[in-house]
């Protein structure tokens, strides 16, 4: 029998609402992410993420471009939040992450977000996959509470850039079933230059330690091979070894566990500022096959055998969203191998 999502246990114990209220208090003087802006988002005072009291949902859809045990046969139920706490110059979702004046039009109530989750479940989606949830973690939790009361029964995926506050992650323990962090850099300099944040290395690694504390290195699957609980660390290979993928792999092995699942991704392509601004020339091309082979070799040499590896051929062409079409922003998606 498939184990129920952990947030339902919290609901039954009467603890889920308490957690939600604790998370929402962080919005009053915002410490929801490591930027610690201290603005009162409950009064819609905005700061770095340009986000106030209510969640912003730019798109929600069944999605088939995630890792195989998240996609299954019916897709992951992706909820794409608008805005972001990072400013990545190569963001593939920049149409929704860095257009705050347009995204305010996509603000929804918590009740409406809960309805979206239930709609995705009704479509047969195997999970609710929150994309870029960090700056909306309290709103996400409130909506999960509302949806759970109305019959939500699928796992919750926290698909994050890893620039997360440990205190927030601790409150999300057992609200989130699956952590899917994108570990971007092994140095602070790259984090500042390419994502406009300070201390990325330290904060992301602290966040991953907390995620690992909650889930361990075991992936829990159901009888159909669908992922129900666990931690999967994504590593996007960037050109010119920006990000130092091998160093991140080694840190995961040594500081977390050699059995942590890694999802190695080849889908990088220059977009947004990386495509046009000469300051970011190191990111101005797709990765070369030699760079990809170096990254896959690092996985093998460091003994990291759990996880998934994208196909190199064509990956940078297939994973190109267009959020002008909010209902189907992804086309022609290939799976991981």
Question: What is each of the regions a protein language model found here?
Answer:
Residues 1-45, 216-337:
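Auxiliary Fe-S-binding modules of radical SAM enzymes
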Residues 49-179, 187-189:
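Conserved Radical SAM active-site core
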Residues 97-98, 137, 162-165, 183-201, ...:
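Conserved radical SAM core fold
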Residues 144-155, 207-211, 289-295:
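Alpha-helix-loop-beta-strand connector modules within alpha/beta enzyme cores
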Residues 192-224:
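Anionic-ligand binding region
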